[in-house]
Amino acid sequence: MEFITQNQAITSLSMINTDIDQPKASLRSRFLLHLIICLLFFVPPCSSQAWDGVVITQADYQGLQAVKQELIDPRGFLRSWNGSGFSACSGGWAGIKCAQGQVIVIQLPWKSLGGRISEKIGQLQALRKLSLHDNNLGGSIPMSLGLIPNLRGVQLFNNRLTGSIPASLGVSHFLQTLDLSNNLLSEIIPPNLADSSKLLRLNLSFNSLSGQIPVSLSRSSSLQFLALDHNNLSGPILDTWGSKSLNLRVLSLDHNSLSGPFPFSLCNLTQLQDFSFSHNRIRGTLPSELSKLTKLRKMDISGNSVSGHIPETLGNISSLIHLDLSQNKLTGEIPISISDLESLNFFNVSYNNLSGPVPTLLSQKFNSSSFVGNSLLCGYSVSTPCPTLPSPSPEKERKPSHRNLSTKDIILIASGALLIVMLILVCVLCCLLRKKANETKAKGGEAGPGAVAAKTEKGGEAEAGGETGGKLVHFDGPMAFTADDLLCATAEIMGKSTYGTVYKATLEDGSQVAVKRLREKITKSQKEFENEINVLGRIRHPNLLALRAYYLGPKGEKLVVFDYMSRGSLATFLHARGPDVHINWPTRMSLIKGMARGLFYLHTHANIIHGNLTSSNVLLDENITAKISDYGLSRLMTAAAGSSVIATAGALGYRAPELSKLKKANTKTDVYSLGVIILELLTGKSPSEALNGVDLPQWVATAVKEEWTNEVFDLELLNDVNTMGDEILNTLKLALHCVDATPSTRPEAQQVMTQLGEIRPEETTATTSEPLIDVPEASASTSQ
């Protein structure tokens, strides 16, 4: 069929009309007239894309054919690019969108396309967006691409493009997004690349670019996101930030060969939220003016030669979540003001020259790996106690002291002595109680006030009476510990929540359990409590944290006992790990599947709605198996306490939008929370962080719509050889389905489980040959 352009079609109509006006018009001419009219006006589009009724121009048709000719299409996505091009603008050609007969969008990501991008793409003069990311494209970027006048977005990341970045791209005055990350590009960054006054996002990370950072990048008035990390850039970091670049929010320059002093002008970027200079050769000191960055969430300068003291003013940046100052030459003490940063969930000052005691709150919140490598630093672990005050020298001892003790000194000494005496009495009392309990057990069932084991109505084993006067009920066979053992165990606070306080209890034999002490004023009456908890105690599933026992004290106290999970919570595992700990895709998918299986069991077999599913309530065992915790605890609480839990979940970003009106959780609200956790695993971002004022699901949905896929996924996933593009993309689609604003359109947990099995069949979910690297043991946390 011969190619038909818009003008040719109109000319044909005019000629046929002339023929019809003649008295002897042939039947064939009339037939052709009706046929062309039907083709042009009455044939519906081939897809859901709206068609404006205009046929593609000849220049654009030829340009697309040239582009197709130089591409390798192993999966046949471009088979539709054939024939006359008549259907190119009506939705018949894959990945093509038009306006008035001209191509405005080419969108073909994740299609396994190879070959190269043709220089004739420059014929598409109306092109606004080119999205060919996550393919296998090689060759150089066409220079003609930068000469397209209305070009607004170029996404070519995750390919094999080589050569230099065309300087012509700096001529595109309407260019808003340029993402060429994760390719094989080399040579220098064109000095004029940021000349566009519309440029918002520039990502050139993970290439082999060399030379210095162009000054124009630090003076762009529109730029909000700049990523140049993982290249071979050298020279100093520019100290010209802030004169015009006041809108910059993200600045990533890590893993280069940049040198020179720390740029003080960085403090002028008052909108900055995230900056990373790690693994360069930066020296000098940190300015106290960093406190002007009031919106800063992440600061990473690890692996440099920065010296001097840590500024006390860093403690004024209340938004700070991630602070990494490790592997530098910092001296002095850690400012106590940093302890005031309530949002801080990652802190690392290891391998510096710091000295003095670690602030108590920091040593309790972060493990020893955050402080090691500082020989003069103390107080961050049992093995690094701070030295006591030195005893006076012999010369001073010979001098008589005539100083009288003040009243304050006498009170302090007396209080200390009294405290020591009380501690000794408590220890003696515990030993006596334990000894008496053991003697009672040795009598083999004699009547008396000792502990007596009895089967409960629900099949658990109860220890009633005893020296504690309380009641301990075990759900799994013989009692592993007595009430006295539990109450005398060494306890370490792990977290607090609406339900109560969680402790890690170390028993006398060295075994560990997690104990949650429920708040007394929010629990149901004892009879209702026992009825509900005896049901929960029978629930067993590989992906649910088992309730092992509970204790009812003589004064109304209620303790519930669970298995202790040494890996901690998923939230800690994902957001508070060290820089050398990587979580590969098979591990993340295994966690997602485990959560889905656990939630399915709760909904279908146990008939329980969780109501407060968060990554803090998903715990990990030694094998990094996901175990959902805190399920069913709402049944033990009053209605008012349940509402409080829902409100807390909403503040953390896991609450389904309809709960603001319903006030009662259901299976669809649980699936929404599961979807948020899946997004958390895919993006590496915490839902508790506000992302430009929107929650995590909204941010992801917007990014996907704008084709910013490279910014959605955790960078570790994009660089992981185990990652399958189709798998993470389909998992992202499923997660967005789970967090749909309309509850009726969300899947049930069973459907989620089924779809995950289709995305990654079970036989491929085992841990791959690339294991987790140096994953440290974390304290278990069930903060929610």
Swiss-Prot record:
Sugar attachment sites are: 82, 203, 232, 268, 316, 348, 353, 367, 404
Q: Which domain of life is it from?
A: Eukaryota
Keywords for the protein's UniProt record, in alphabetical order: ATP-binding, Cell membrane, Glycoprotein, Kinase, Leucine-rich repeat, Membrane, Nucleotide-binding, Phosphoprotein, Receptor, Repeat, Serine/threonine-protein kinase, Signal, Transferase, Transmembrane, Transmembrane helix
Q: Which residues form the signal peptide?
A: 1-48
PTM:
Autophosphorylated.
Q: Region (Disordered) spans which residues?
A: 441-467, 760-784
- Quote the EC number: 2.7.11.1
One GO cellular-component annotation of the UniProt record comes to: plasma membrane
Record: residues binding ATP: 494-502, 516
Q: Give ranges for the Cytoplasmic compartment.
A: 431-784
GO molecular function ontology, one term from the record? ATP binding
Q: Where are the LRR repeats?
A: 126-148, 150-172, 174-197, 198-220, 222-242, 247-268, 271-294, 295-317, 319-342, 343-365
Q: Which residues lie on this side of the membrane: Extracellular?
A: 49-409
**Which cysteines are cross-linked by disulfides?**
none
| Tissues expressing the protein | Expressed in meristems, including roots, vegetative, inflorescence and floral meristems, and in embryos.
Q: What is known of its domains?
A: The protein kinase domain is predicted to be catalytically inactive. Lacks the conserved Asp active site at position 612, which is replaced by an Asn residue. However, according to Ref.9, the kinase activity is conserved.
Name the family the entry cites: Belongs to the protein kinase superfamily. Ser/Thr protein kinase family.
Q: How does it assemble?
A: Interacts with AGL24.
Tell me the protein's name: Probable leucine-rich repeat receptor-like protein kinase IMK3
State the species of origin.
Answer: Arabidopsis thaliana (Mouse-ear cress)
Q: Which gene encodes it?
A: IMK3
